[in-house]
Amino acid sequence: MPVSFFSGRAAAGAGRKRMENVKDIIVIGIAGGTGSGKTTITQKLQAHFGSDVTVLYHDNYYKPHHDLTLEERSKLNYDHPDAFDTGLMVRDLRELKRGHSIECPVYDYTIHDRTRSTLHIVPSRVIVVEGILIFQSKELRDLMDIKIFVDTDADVRILRRIQRDVKERGRSLDSVINQYLTTVKPMHEAFVEPSKKFADIIIPEGGRNQVAIDMVIGRVQAHLDRRA
């Protein structure tokens, strides 16, 4: 979740020492529609594994549009695969898997643009990659050991999105609804929902499905125990 109104999503893992045994690293991809509960699952993994978890948010890899005005940026389609610099995320994830630190871009939702600052991120034993369209790229998928799709009813997702964008991102209700109808919903149907076929695990109802979350935690713990 956003650590501040300015910095968007902060990638967990900043400030720790370099990972020495890179064979220990497991990468978990968590995809699903907007408001599906992806971040809730990510937070539960963080709560269980603590400092063993580093998180990369696809949102931080939105392409920069410094050449456009705020009004122009607000009208862009942010739910299409082309909105993301996924190639950069692939390169960054590869570096993390090699045990190297990265400088992660930072996206600011309030200005609809990437900021000039970066986050210094170091790898950990569990790397979570989270985003609505992370399964669209084969290069990115191939770097994941476990691929999870969070499947939540559309009515629930839009209500969560309205609440989040109005409260946390300074959006108006009208702008959120208009964006949902013109880009979010059609892009979900065209790109997000079809990417579910790439998932190893489908979790209905997101963070409320404790049985499924416990199974994921058990799978990750087994991996860590084997490498201990």
Task: Label every PLM stretch briefly.
Residues 115-169:
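ATP-dependent NMP and nucleoside kinases share a basic, alpha-helical "lid"
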Residues 33:
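P-loop (Walker A) phosphate-binding loop of NTP-binding proteins
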Residues 38:
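Conserved lysine of the Walker
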Residues 67-109:
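Conserved nucleotide-sensing/catalytic segment adjacent to the nucleotide-binding pocket
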Residues 41:
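Hydrophobic positions on the alpha1 helix immediately C-terminal to the Walker A/P-loop
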Residues 4-5, 16-21, 122-123, 163-166, ...:
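NTP-dependent small-molecule kinase module
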